[in-house]
Design a protein with these regions (language model features):
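RecB-family 4Fe-4S metal-dependent nuclease core
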Residues: 1-254
Length: 254
């Protein structure tokens, strides 16, 4: 972990950004543990092939951009990385009610606006691509399948879901149930002036996801119910474009 669990100011972030050795060592360690499955804290680093060397340099470059952006966001705290959040929902089908656990892993949780009236948490989902989701007019647009390609609404669905769970169901990092903002942080956009990763609905940044909770969860449960409903045929989409980037396309032969 590069960043301490403390309120961050610009000076230590800039010092860290300039410390190429420390950043290199952290990336090397992460590659050894995550790519090669070596024990945590191992001091021996495997020799990398050409592609792996390129990936290492890209990661180092991305970290530099991220630290430069974080420097503009001070004061804030990084509360957690890779934090898992889940919530159980009651789903109704023609065969009755059942409980389903929904959630996943948050890339990063920040506390921003520390010590001010706008003090809140920010649920961050890192994105390495270049296509950012278009601002949505309403929560209903998040669940419109036609917006998956047009507006990348699937990114927004995940970020909002995690934020709702974080806002009310995390005694470790949000025991006071502070407001939570969902954010999609596109690494390649970090250099843009006035860039903000926080999602927008109807032209306004989401400063408290609870404002949208009721509508979102009703539509979420409705969508899940349709998936599990025995009377509704579960068939592949007729829109082949949806399948191009789908990680599950091998399951249906697409």
């Amino acid at each position: 972990n590069l960043l301490p669990e403390a309120i961050l100011s610009a000076e230590p972030l800039e010092r860290l950004r300039r410390n190429k050795t420390e950043i290199f060592d952290v990336v090397e360690q992460a590659i050894s543990e995550e790519l090669f499955n070596l024990p945590e804290g191992t001091k021996t680093h495997p020799e990398l092939n050409g592609l792996q060397l390129i990936i290492r340099e890209v990661i180092i470059k991305y970290l530099g951009k991220l630290l430069e952006y974080d420097k503009r966001m001070v004061p804030f705290m990084v509360l957690a990385h890779e934090s898992e959040v889940y919530k159980e929902y009651s789903i109704e089908t023609s065969e009755g009610m059942f409980q389903l656990k929904v959630g996943g892993r948050i890339d990063r949780i920040d506390e921003i606006g520390v010590g001010t009236s706008s003090d809140r948490l920010r649920v961050v989902d890192y994105k390495s691509g270049t296509v950012r989701p278009t601002d949505l007019k309403s929560i209903e647009e998040v669940f419109d399948v036609n917006n998956i390609l047009k507006k990348h609404s699937d990114y927004c669905l995940q970020a909002i879901l995690y934020s709702i769970i974080e806002s009310e169901n995390d005694k470790t990092y949000n025991p006071e149930q502070k407001p939570v903002s969902p954010a999609l942080l596109f690494i390649q956009s970090l250099g843009k002036k006035d860039y903000s990763p926080v999602l927008r609905i109807g032209g306004e940044e989401i400063t408290d996801v609870q404002r949208y909770k009721e509508d979102f969860e009703n539509l979420l449960k409705q969508t899940i119910s349709e998936i599990y409903e025995p009377k509704v045929p579960f068939t592949p989409t007729s829109e082949i474009k949806f399948c191009q980037m789908c990680p599950y396309r091998s399951l249906c032969g697409r």
